[in-house]
């Protein structure tokens, strides 16, 4: 999965410099969010997040916050428990 996140980091960079439209990035973002709902992916991210760009780390941390908020408000009943 680290390879996927390396690709996501590159895609986020391309989005930030204007090579990807917002709707393209949001499609990637939905994939990232669905992956992060799996506990082993969350662990992988926690163990290797520092090897990604600061901007991408911030974006993923925002996605993690969204997941936690969704779980707290009962919007994701089947989501793996997020620490």
Question: Residue ranges of each PLM-predicted region?
Answer:
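Amphipathic alpha-helical "stem/stalk" segments
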Residues: 1-83
């Amino acid at each position: 999965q680290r390879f996927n996140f390396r690709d996501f980091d590159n895609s986020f960079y391309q989005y930030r410099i204007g090579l990807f439209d917002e709707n393209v990035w949001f499609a990637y973002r939905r994939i990232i969010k669905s992956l992060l709902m799996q506990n082993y992916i969350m662990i992988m991210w926690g163990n290797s997040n520092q090897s990604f760009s600061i901007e991408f780390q911030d974006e993923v941390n925002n996605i993690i916050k969204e997941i936690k908020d969704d779980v707290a408000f009962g919007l994701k009943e089947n989501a793996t428990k997020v620490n």
